[in-house]
Each structure stands twice: as structure tokens, then as C-alpha cells.
Amino acid sequence: MKKNTLAALILTTLSAGQLVSLQVHAAGQLNVWEDIKKSDGIKTAVSDFEKQYNVKVNVQEMPYAQQLEKLRLDGPAGIGPDVLVIPNDQLGGAVVQGLLSPLTLDQAKQDVFTPASINAFHMDNVLYGVPKAVETLVLIYNKDLIAQPLDSLQAWFDYSKKQREEGKYGLLAKFDQIYYSWGAIGPMGGYIFGKNDKGGFNPQDVGLNKPGAVEAVTFLKKFYAEKVFPAGILGDNGLNAIDSLFTEKKAAAVINGPWAFQPYEAAGINYGVVPLPTLPDGKPMSSFLGVKGYVVSTWSKDKALAQQFIEFINQPQYVKARYIATGEIPPLKAMIDDPVIKNDEKASAVAVQSARATAMPGIPEMGEVWGPANAALELSLTGKQDPQAALDGAEKQIKMQIEAMQASNQ
């Protein structure tokens, strides 16, 4: 066999947490696009991979949300990456457009990740990516205003009513947007899309008006009907209003994401972070999971080695190093109980909640859900329309928009 050809490549298996493989002798190089200011997190893994596989890995940084758009141009031109990072909500469009190569990863290797995170990179039961980092909603509370967070959403409602009697606020949340209210709707029986016979999403089956969804919205409605929430947190500027009330120490707690940690720290808030509370039926609130993942370009000249790279850098020791360097929460099951995360209040809360979360559907039709769902929630929660009627209207509107979108793509 010629020196400059691939001599041996055996896909790896994990045993006792270690990667077992025969060395691959490869000519050439791999080009990797990493997220901006995140390449330090994979520096050691890249160096070790280069030594073990006798290949040069070129790492270039760029914002992860822009990588797929750049791939559309650079891939066909032959100057694109072998491996890149994308958010899971871009997966569906990328697969439909033929931009990504499927991965071959046995079930045991998939099972080391939290189910929602690995499922986020499946489309029609085919795997296209390996999860790198997750973010999701958590409950953030001011330790100077409430010593211990409450366990249930009902308890938070009761506490918030008492706070209003004193001119203060208890818990605030943007429940008039599906991104935030999903935490109740999903566990109580609603769903965005049903499944098709391939195990993927069926965009013709919209479940936002099911009895469980109506029950959830009816429960959330009392936060507005009994004026536990101020009117100012409704609508497009509601998130800014919530942040202001929390940083001004007028609200004891908020439901928000890790992106709020730094601004709250800058405002001098002595805050704590915990997973979301439980619902009336005792189930914990869910949340939508945002996942960044490593994928392989369809234009990669060595797709097998590109996948080997992704597997290699996601071994536990490299995942831990990546977390320490970047602070991004990894969805590796073994890391949830690792002291480096478990002893970090913020990281632990995000990790635990991520395991309870639902990956946002990555199909293009998801884009047709947000507007009608949010409009129906605002109508319901403000009492302008009955929850069942509002959610029925949203389901009808979503289906109409999806039908129009699909027709325009034919």
C-alpha cells in the first residue's frame, strides 16, 4: 500500500471510558472550524490526535451560527472544512440541502450522551452530528431576597402572590413565548410535532392544542390573571423588563438561561441557580435544549477520519478539559457527576436541567411554529381568548404556513 494512502482505519470502541483503536496512518490534513474563542478548549485533543494519527489538523475559528452559511460557498469550492460546528436548529435545513455527511456511530457510543442532546442531531433516525455543548433555561434567584429556592411552580405562585401584597415580585418568566412555556406544555402532554414512521418528526402532526397543552396554559394563565406578573413583561420587550426588575432587586427569581449569568454578575446580584421547579403533577418542568454539535461536511475528502476526529476529541478527559477552558456545559453523562461540574452551582443546574430538556425540532418547519404559538399564548394568558380556542387557532395557522412553505419548495 502506498505511503500516502490510508493504511488502516478501525472505528473506535469505548472500553472503561478509554478509546481503543489501531493507529491510522494518513497523509494530508483535516480542516476544522471551531466556534469563536473556543479553540483553546480542544488544543490538547488536537495535538494528541495529530500524534496518534499522523495527520495535520488545521483549526480555524468563526462564529458557530455562521459556519453553515460559509460552508455553502467554501464546500463546493474545495476550501471548506472537514469538521464544523453548528446549532441543532440548523440541522434540518443542512440535511435537506445535502451539506452534511451522515455519521456511523454505534448505539453504545451514542448512549454516553444525554438522550436529548444526541437526539438533537438525528433526522429521520439518521445521525449527523455529535453534541459538543448544551444550554437551556434554569431558575435564577436572588439569595439576598429568598434564602432557599422553592421546589414547585405552585409554591412560586403562592410566594409571588404574597410578594405582590408588599409591592414586590416573586418569580418572573416569559410564559407568553413558547420557548419559555414549553417547560409546562411538554411534560403535561403537548408536543410540537409527532413522529413519522422513520422516527423523525412529522410536521403534519402538530400537538400544541392537545388536552395536556391546554391544561398547562390554563395553569400558567393564573400568573397573569391574578397579576402576579406585571403587564410590562408581555410582548417583544418583556425580556428586558424581566432583567431590569431582577437586577433592580425588585424580583426574587426569574426563569432565564446561562446567557444572563454575566449581566447579573455585572449588576452585583448575589444569585443562585437551580433546575426548573416541578409542575402540579409532580413532574419537573422541561425546557428547550439548545445544542452545539460537531458535524462532517459532505465535501470532506476523508469523512471516516473526520468522524474519527470527532469521536477522539469527545473522550471524557478531553471533554473535561474543554469545559474547564470554555465553560460550555458538555452533554456527556459522565460529566454531570464529575466534581468539576457538580461542585459548580451554575454548571450543575444547567447540566441537570439539560438532562430533563427537549431538543428543539431541527426540521425547517419549526420556523413556522414560533409566531402562531406565541400569538396564541399571549391571547390565552391575557384572557383575550379561551386557551383551547387560541391553541386550536395556532395549530391551524401552523399547518397552513407549513403547507405553504412546502408548496413553495416544490
Residue spans for each PLM region:
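Short, solvent-exposed loop/beta-turn-alpha elements that line the ligand-binding surface or hinge
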Residues: 105-113, 191-215, 266, 278-287, ...
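Long, aromatic- and glycine/proline-rich binding clefts that accommodate carbohydrate-like moieties
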Residues: 120, 274, 323-372, 379, ...
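Conserved N-terminal structural module of periplasmic/extracytoplasmic solute-binding proteins
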Residues: 4, 9-11, 22-93, 107, ...
